[in-house]
């Protein structure tokens, strides 16, 4: 019985399958945590969604920005780009069922230390870590992140899903203290959970830079995890930031996006012993 955590798949289903074979994943006993961006750009988004959904309680998903974009495209709010590579998924006979399932997934998951049974997964554990697609806002305490994740999940699972999806676009407010209305809190929280990489030194969100920190010459921005107080007391697992290539200067941080869809590799982490498993991308030159 083990907990495995995997980075951004983005439709790279063959690489995911190879990793699961590497670790002898047992869906009846093991649990797979997925750091978001299950879909887009890669060749097999439909197969990825169908498989993860089929795992039932053995899969714990957090939504990423590409997953949310897919929901918006399906709802007619946004148009798919050719590079999104979503045509087969959107034309699938079970697309509505898949979208309902996807929309019901959270933006934040707790990762327990043990995996003895399904109940243990749902029990609060003071020593456990957390996973979200991009991280946790340095302007939040953990209690606020949990509250906002529940708030968003409720909205996206409601009959007003499409209304809320349309409201999530935009980069303002990028300061939690200026997020006064319900809509502003929704948009800020979506951005913090799924788009954040760097923050300005006052903790506000910065959206332009995607490079690794060592390549950034700007002095007024830092990685979100260098400002967060939450991660001094708990570990955080996230994806989204491919240029980190799984590396971080902070001991409680576990970046798992290693750019499989860009031809690099898909990374999986076995939680109890922190052992990494790597599968090279089939999209490499």
Curated annotation (Swiss-Prot):
It catalyses: P(1),P(4)-bis(5'-adenosyl) tetraphosphate + H2O = 2 ADP + 2 H(+). Gene3D superfamilies: 3.60.21.10. Its EC number is 3.6.1.41. One of its GO terms (molecular function) is bis(5'-nucleosyl)-tetraphosphatase (symmetrical) activity. CDD domains: MPP_ApaH. Disulfide bonds: none annotated. InterPro entries: ApaH, Calcineurin-like_PHP_ApaH, Metallo-depent_PP-like. The keyword Disulfide bond does not apply. It holds the Pfam family Metallophos. It comes from the Bacteria. Keywords: Hydrolase. Hydrolyzes diadenosine 5',5'''-P1,P4-tetraphosphate to yield ADP. Belongs to the Ap4A hydrolase family. This is Bis(5'-nucleosyl)-tetraphosphatase, symmetrical. It comes from Colwellia psychrerythraea (strain 34H / ATCC BAA-681) (Vibrio psychroerythus).
């Amino acid at each position: 019985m083990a907990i495995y955590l995997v980075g951004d798949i983005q439709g790279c289903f063959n690489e995911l399958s190879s990793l699961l074979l590497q670790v002898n994943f047992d869906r009846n006993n093991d649990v797979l945590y997925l750091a978001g961006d299950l879909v887009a750009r890669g060749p097999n988004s439909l197969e990825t969604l169908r498989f993860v959904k089929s795992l039932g309680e053995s899969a714990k998903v957090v939504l990423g920005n590409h997953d949310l974009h897919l929901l918006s495209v399906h709802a007619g709010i946004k148009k798919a780009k050719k590079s999104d590579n979503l045509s087969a998924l959107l034309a699938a006979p079970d697309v509505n069922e898949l979208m309902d399932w996807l929309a019901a997934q959270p933006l934040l998951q707790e990762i327990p230390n043990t995996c003895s049974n399904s109940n243990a997964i749902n029990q609060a554990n003071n020593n456990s870590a957390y996973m979200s697609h991009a991280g946790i806002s340095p302007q939040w305490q953990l209690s606020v992140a949990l509250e906002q994740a529940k708030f968003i999940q409720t909205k996206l699972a409601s009959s007003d899903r499409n209304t809320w999806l349309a409201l999530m676009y935009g980069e303002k407010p990028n300061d939690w203290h200026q997020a006064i209305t319900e809509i502003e809190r929704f948009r800020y929280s979506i951005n913090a959970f799924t788009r954040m990489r760097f923050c300005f030194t006052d903790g506000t969100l910065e959206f332009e830079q995607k490079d690794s920190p060592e390549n950034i010459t700007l002095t007024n921005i830092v990685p979100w995890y260098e400002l967060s107080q939450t991660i001094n007391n708990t570990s955080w697992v996230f994806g989204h930031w491919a240029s980190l290539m799984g590396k971080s200067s902070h001991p409680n941080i576990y970046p798992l996006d290693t750019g499989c869809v860009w031809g690099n590799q898909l990374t999986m982490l076995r939680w109890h012993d922190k052992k990494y498993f790597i599968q090279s991308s089939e999209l490499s030159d």
